[in-house]
Amino acid sequence: MSTTLAPAVGAPPASGRDDTIPRLDLAGVWVVIPCYKVRSHIGRVIARTPDWITGIVCVDDACPEHSGEFVTREVADRRVVVVTLAENQGVGGATLAGYGEAIARGARVLVKVDGDDQMDLAHLPALVAPILLGQSDYTKGNRFSSQSHIQGMPSVRVLGNIGLSFAAKLSTGYWNIFDPTNGFTAIHADVAEILLSRPIARRYFFETDLLYHLGTLRAVVRDIPMPARYADEISNLKIGSTILPFAGRHLRNWARRMIGDYFVRDFNIATLEVLVGGASLAFGIAHALAWISVRLPGQAASAGMVMGAALPIIIGVQLLLQAINYDVTHTPTQPIHPYLRTVKQMAATDKLRALSAAPDRRD
């Protein structure tokens, strides 16, 4: 019996199959597993992968434990393909290499799963369903959708993720998401194919930087609720050494997004609000500081002086808040992968027609 997605409310009875519900075993879903120091877990992760998954790409990221060789030798699952990288490229580099391999083999949806057995594969249908139904281009887990989901998560991680989530909202433009560092993700292959040529961060900033590049494509991103899960893995992430680099990269992406979205690719009401609001706020602050620097000891500010500084500041803050509101309400809502798929199919059809119309040059 083939695995299918659960029918939606109002679906026809079981006696008549609804063709709008995609069959998972025919959906072309591939799993990509970056492998670095996961030899003790990788076999269990592969064994738990559902039968409806078409293929599994294990990417040995120059693993000192030779995880790739271990999988080749010990795992009999015929769906498994092992890719070995000559040099360590980080989780991002390994994931992108896996994407490329799966796309070359005809994958339609790509799911990234860590090899440390932290991710509950029972959530795979929920992760791929919005993509298969044409509702989203990229989905990711969100461990903060319920208080019960973060029970057992260390307090440091909770606070860190809250801070990173807010920073990611600013730098990526996806105000509708949370938990940006969650590595349990799925993406449509046509969207991933475009990202392969982008300068995406290869290491721990990968998931957040990927969101930034998805934002430049206006791809639709959706959170999938799931609980936190921790096994006996040892994290390779050193929090103290990544805070400043992460902050710098968020600031860089925010600046690039502001320039790209509001000055290069578009010029709209939010652009004017940023320009006028920023200038008004700067003028009000400068006016107040200038008076403070020249005032006599004990001299009180006149009503005109106060209003001359306060009014521009108030107007500037209000305009900037309106610009933020515009940014929040213009999160992408129209998936791009149906368009990309149609363009690709049309190009392939035109190519076939051109070949068939070409004169026969055989002697």
Language-model features, listed with the residues they occupy:
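Short, well-formed alpha-helical segments that are part of the catalytic scaffolds
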Residues: 16, 36-51
